[in-house]
């Protein structure tokens, strides 16, 4: 079945999350060491499920302060500019090809400001951009998915494809809801069961264009 809608994880799937964070830390004089990226991701995941809701800028700041004992001002600046991190080179052209087949919607654990930054880096707007700041939930909370379905006026099912490099944040829940899942094998991805597996978004463009 061809997709009627594609939703995308952004950080780690479209945006090169690790490279962006590594470069930001290097500019602050604190190179990222082995194992620290995963530790930061895991701490962010825990903070995202706490209440009251915090925006992603604050989540990033707290995770850097707690995991790396990082300076508060630098950590806040890194969180503010996360949407300016580089996109994967294959992303812009591939997403344009995919958007010719079906709407492409960001479904991202980030802030609205990061969406403005990231779409500027892509060079165009996606069909819609729905972020944690909009719904006051973070993936993998199923309530995020329910709110996305409500906003888009769609029912979960195989015509809705969800695309991510992360099983734990995205694909496991998407599968449980009956969506078609696509795993993108990015560096530092977290693999898991998926209906389709591609090396990059060019591979996805080829898949949906068949």
Predicted regions and their residues:
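N-terminal helical cap/lid subdomain that shapes the substrate entry/recognition surface
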Residues: 2-89, 93
């Amino acid at each position: 079945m061809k997709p009627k809608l594609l939703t995308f994880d952004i950080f780690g799937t479209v945006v090169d999350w690790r490279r962006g964070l590594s470069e930001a830390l290097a500019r602050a004089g604190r190179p990222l060491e082995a194992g620290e990226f995963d530790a930061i991701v895991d701490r962010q995941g825990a903070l995202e499920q706490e209440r009251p809701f915090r925006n992603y800028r604050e989540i990033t700041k707290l995770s850097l302060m707690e995991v790396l004992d990082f300076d508060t001002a630098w950590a806040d600046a890194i969180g503010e500019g996360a949407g300016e991190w580089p996109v994967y080179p294959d992303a812009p052209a591939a997403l344009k090809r995919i958007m010719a087949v079906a709407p492409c919607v960001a479904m991202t654990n980030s802030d609205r400001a990061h969406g403005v930054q990231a779409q500027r880096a892509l060079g165009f707007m996606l069909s819609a951009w729905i972020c944690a700041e909009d719904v006051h939930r973070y993936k993998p909370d199923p309530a995020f998915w329910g709110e996305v379905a409500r906003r888009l006026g769609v029912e979960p099912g195989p015509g809705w494809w969800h695309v991510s490099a992360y099983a734990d944040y995205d694909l496991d829940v998407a599968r449980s809801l009956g969506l078609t899942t696509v795993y993108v094998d990015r560096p530092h991805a977290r693999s898991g069961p998926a209906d389709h597996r591609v090396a990059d978004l060019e591979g996805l463009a080829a898949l949906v264009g068949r």
